[in-house]
Structures are given as structure tokens and as C-alpha cells.
UniProtKB/Swiss-Prot annotation:
Annotated keywords: Ribonucleoprotein, Ribosomal protein, RNA-binding, rRNA-binding
Function statement: This protein binds to the 23S rRNA, and is important in its secondary structure. It is located near the subunit interface in the base of the L7/L12 stalk, and near the tRNA binding site of the peptidyltransferase center.
Subunit text: Part of the 50S ribosomal subunit.
SUPFAM superfamilies referenced in this protein's UniProt entry, alphabetically: Ribosomal protein L6 (SSF56053)
GO molecular function: rRNA binding; structural constituent of ribosome
Similarity annotation: Belongs to the universal ribosomal protein uL6 family.
Gene: rplF
Full protein name: Large ribosomal subunit protein uL6
Length: 178
């Protein structure tokens, strides 16, 4: 039995979960998320918590068991607390500014780089070199953060670029000269 998959998912008050066929829908104070559960896995509600079960011990069922439990647990956390990622910009002249609900970056290119906020994502600019990506869908928050980081990845020689808060950038030494 999967150590992660067998753990029940606690359902906090204020969260409404409906299981219709293979679709699990989670409604909470921050919004609504839904997920289609793959065939052999079943999600059942028992005494104020959700239990994810699998019918057999086949390799596919075992691999999907823990995954499904974690995805549903992330949905419950998302609609109650939400998710956020803080990113920092390092480099002379590199900055970010809010343009309505979107962001505009100056990253050393000859033009500003606009980033539109997808549905369910909210940006918060704390300083010109620090901003936060907020949302209820953990996967979407991570995807948007990774796309923004990819606009100018941290340089291994000088460390300039967009990085996650607390990310350690491995630095290279560079040429030694004569």
C-alpha cells in the first residue's frame, strides 16, 4: 500500500467536495477546482475526510494511488489557503512593474517584456525587484513562475536574472587571464 496514498485527506470546514463519477470538485472560500480521477482509482468520502483507494496492486494502480491523493490534497489546500511563489530579480537595470493585472519586465533586452496573468493567477509587486505569483492551483502557480524565470534565467557567472526567493545559484569562476 502506498504510504502517501493510504493517508486520509482531512476536509476543513467551509470546503465542499463533490464526487461525480470520475470528477472530484472542491469548492472553498478562495474558489473552485476540479480534477478527473484516472480509471482504477476511486475517491470516497468518509466521516469528514476523503479516502483514495485502488482496486488492485498492479503497477499502474500503485503509481496512480499516491499521485491522485496528492493532487486532491493540493486542491483542498489551494481553495482554503492558496499557493504563492516569490521571485526576485537580480541585475543592474532589471526590474518589474505592474500594468493592471499584468506585469512588465525590463530584463536587459532592447524592449520591455510583458507577461499576461492567466485565469486564476494574481501578481503582487512588492518592490521593483521582487514580486509574488498567487493562485489556488499549485500546478498553474508553478508553471507561470517557471515561465517568468525562463525569461532571463540566472547567469552562472554574475548571478543576474530572475530567480525564486531563496534559490541558490551555482556560480562559475570564469576565465583567469594571464
Amino acid at each position: 500500500m502506498s504510504r502517501i496514498g493510504r493517508l486520509p485527506i482531512p476536509v476543513p470546514s467551509g470546503v465542499d467536495i463533490t464526487v461525480e463519477g470520475a470528477t472530484v470538485t472542491v469548492k472553498g472560500p478562495k474558489g473552485t477546482l476540479s480534477h478527473v480521477v484516472v480509471e482504477p482509482i476511486a475517491v470516497n468520502r468518509e466521516e469528514g475526510q476523503l479516502v483514495v483507494t485502488r482496486p488492485d496492486d498492479e503497477r499502474r494502480s500503485r503509481s496512480l494511488h499516491g499521485l491522485t491523493r496528492t493532487l486532491v490534497s493540493n486542491m483542498v489546500t489551494g481553495v482554503t489557503a492558496g499557493y504563492s511563489k516569490t521571485l526576485e530579480i537580480v541585475g543592474v537595470g532589471y526590474r518589474v512593474q505592474a500594468k493592471g493585472s499584468d506585469l512588465e519586465f525590463a530584463l536587459g533586452y532592447s524592449h520591455p517584456v510583458p507577461v499576461k496573468a492567466p485565469e486564476g493567477i494574481r501578481f503582487e509587486v512588492q518592490t521593483p525587484t521582487r514580486f509574488v505569483v498567487h493562485g489556488i492551483d499549485k500546478q498553474l502557480v508553478g508553471e507561470v513562475s517557471a515561465k517568468i524565470r525562463g525569461l532571463r534565467k540566472p547567469d552562472p557567472y554574475k548571478g543576474k536574472g530572475v530567480r525564486y526567493q531563496g534559490e541558490v545559484v551555482r556560480r562559475k569562476v570564469g576565465k583567469t587571464g594571464k
